[in-house]
């Protein structure tokens, strides 16, 4: 759980932290000699605590990534298949045969544009209050997901940011999951435009009573009114 009540607590400073270093503490102005002394804790102590918290969350993170990057036989992602086939058709028309280019196209279109946004902003889907602590922690998880989808080699060293170092060991395995997901999508039976339209119509019928269109229209209007001068 990422609820503040489940975060590790520094018994001396009464501060919470999770998958990020408490840099906000270090940036605060000095108030007393004792408080200043508390802030001189070795970075290794913080790293140990971060690794401990990471271990607690590891199974949940693994399950999350597998849920995102897996295909259910009873409900294959037809829209993803149709769109990925479109990208492959565009690559073929333009004489692009480099598989890395297609990987980048697919990654930029779905994992990075959609899933990373959801990972960093769960309030878009769930009725929750995202605190600053949770926001920082979700950014670490989102970074791990981004690295998993990348094809570039991770260049890590002692000066690398903690959010990249924390999951460096798991990234190779996560990348295999991403590649397997793309391959499974590619091996699915292609859809015609008529089949895709029928699928979208069926999905619309399923949820036609789940949303308040008036509220949605009001939100769109407020958005348009706000940015109309621009």
Annotated model-derived regions:
Residues 1-230:
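Extended alpha-helical scaffold/tether regions of large eukaryotic proteins
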């Amino acid at each position: 759980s990422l609820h503040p009540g489940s975060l590790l607590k520094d018994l001396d400073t009464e501060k919470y932290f999770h998958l990020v270093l408490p840099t906000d503490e270090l940036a605060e102005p000095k108030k007393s000699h004792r408080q200043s002394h508390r802030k001189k804790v070795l970075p290794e102590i913080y790293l140990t605590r971060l690794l401990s918290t990471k271990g607690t969350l590891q199974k949940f993170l693994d399950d999350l990534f597998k849920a995102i990057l897996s295909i259910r036989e009873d409900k294959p992602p037809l829209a993803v298949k149709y769109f990925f086939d479109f990208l492959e058709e565009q690559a073929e028309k333009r004489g692009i045969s480099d598989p890395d280019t297609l990987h980048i196209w697919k990654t930029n279109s779905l994992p990075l544009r959609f899933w990373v946004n959801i990972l960093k902003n769960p309030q878009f889907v769930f009725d929750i209050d995202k605190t600053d602590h949770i926001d920082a922690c979700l950014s670490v998880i989102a970074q791990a997901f981004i690295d998993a989808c990348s094809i570039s080699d991770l260049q890590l060293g002692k000066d690398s940011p903690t959010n990249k170092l924390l999951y460096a060991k798991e990234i190779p395995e996560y990348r295999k999951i991403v590649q397997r997901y793309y391959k499974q999508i590619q091996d699915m039976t292609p859809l015609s435009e008529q089949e895709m339209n029928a699928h979208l119509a069926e999905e619309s019928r399923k949820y036609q009573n789940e949303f308040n269109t008036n509220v949605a229209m009001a939100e769109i209007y407020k958005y348009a009114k706000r940015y109309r001068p621009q």
